[in-house]
Amino acid sequence: MQAPRAALVFALVIALVPVGRGNYEELENSGDTTVESERPNKVTIPSTFAAVTIKETLNANINSTNFAPDENQLEFILMVLIPLILLVLLLLSVVFLATYYKRKRTKQEPSSQGSQSALQTYELGSENVKVPIFEEDTPSVMEIEMEELDKWMNSMNRNADFECLPTLKEEKESNHNPSDSES
């Protein structure tokens, strides 16, 4: 939950902090240079009126370039920040949906340890009646393990017939009559 919040805060900080390099490059490439550098050094106007007009034109050029960063910031918001916010919202919705379905699935599939109901359902006629389960009705761990052992032994006997392994009776007979195999 912290990671999406951190990503959102990071995106907002990036959007709100103006980038200084872009403004510098715009001023450098905009062609707004002082009038003095465009004129040859041979001609200098010593009058105060000329200096005032140069400063006014320079201020007007600088003020006209100040509107460009605001437009660039608006373009940045439209092109980067809005899709980024939509992507974060999409990821958050996927995370919430995944957790919702995960919780729903765990509620539907109860675990085998301790979650069994204390009531057992029996059908009596057309009605389902819930009857409490008593200790005598539930098999003990030893009974369950013995049943599993019997199943395993039966499967071993069936497999032994197919693989031509000696059965238990054949092994016992061979153990009782060792003199037959020695002579």
UniProtKB/Swiss-Prot annotation:
Is Signal among this UniProt entry's keywords? Answer: yes
Q: Where is this region: Disordered?
A: 163-183
Look up the signal peptide feature and give its range.
1-22
Q: Which residues lie on this side of the membrane: Extracellular?
A: 23-75
The entry's localization annotation reads: Membrane
Q: Name one GO cellular component term.
A: membrane
- Does the record's keyword annotation contain Phosphoprotein? yes
**Phosphoserine occurs at which residues?**
S179
Provide the membrane topology annotation. Single-pass type I membrane protein
Q: Give the protein name, as stated in the record.
A: Transmembrane protein 154
The species this protein was found in: Homo sapiens (Human)
Give the classification, highest ranks: Eukaryota, Metazoa, Chordata, Craniata, Vertebrata
Question: Quick one: which gene encodes this?
Answer: TMEM154
